[in-house]
Curated annotation (Swiss-Prot):
Region ranges (Disordered): 1-23
Name by which UniProt lists this protein: Small ribosomal subunit protein uS14
UniProt keywords, alphabetically: Ribonucleoprotein, Ribosomal protein, RNA-binding, rRNA-binding
Role description: Binds 16S rRNA, required for the assembly of 30S particles and may also be responsible for determining the conformation of the 16S rRNA at the A site.
Family membership: Belongs to the universal ribosomal protein uS14 family.
Gene: rpsN
Biased composition (Basic residues): 11-23
Keyword set includes DNA repair: no
One Pfam family linked to the record: Ribosomal_S14
GO function terms (MF aspect): rRNA binding; structural constituent of ribosome
HAMAP family reported for this sequence: Ribosomal_uS14_1
Subunit description: Part of the 30S ribosomal subunit. Contacts proteins S3 and S10.
Length: 101
């Protein structure tokens, strides 16, 4: 089980990234637009740099919804390999069948 503070920190980052996504996209579009004057593009770069680091989508970590484990997660199920195995062996994951031969 992951620390509650780590899980909450990640949830806070998700919220910040979601709220700041339109503004970041607007600034990045201005920076990438070569037809804009250099001063305007530089000002947009400074504004983007002033934004909080945690508002960037790259700071978000995929975590297990059940345990909060940060590594070895399946995106489709949003579960770690350990939680997926436990739920799968109990028959709680639809379509997942334990192989035997």
């Amino acid at each position: 089980m992951a620390k509650k503070s780590s899980v909450e920190k990640n949830n806070r980052r998700k919220r910040m990234a979601k709220n700041a996504a339109p503004k970041r996209a607007r600034l990045k579009a201005i920076i990438a637009d070569k037809t804009k004057p250099m001063e305007e593009r530089f000002a947009a770069t400074l504004k983007l740099a002033e934004m909080p680091r945690n508002s960037s989508a790259t700071r978000i970590r995929n975590r297990c919804e059940l345990t909060g484990r940060p590594r070895s997660n399946y995106r489709k199920n949003k579960l770690s390999r350990i939680a997926l195995r436990e739920l799968g062996s109990k028959g709680l994951v639809p379509g997942l069948v334990k192989s035997s031969w």
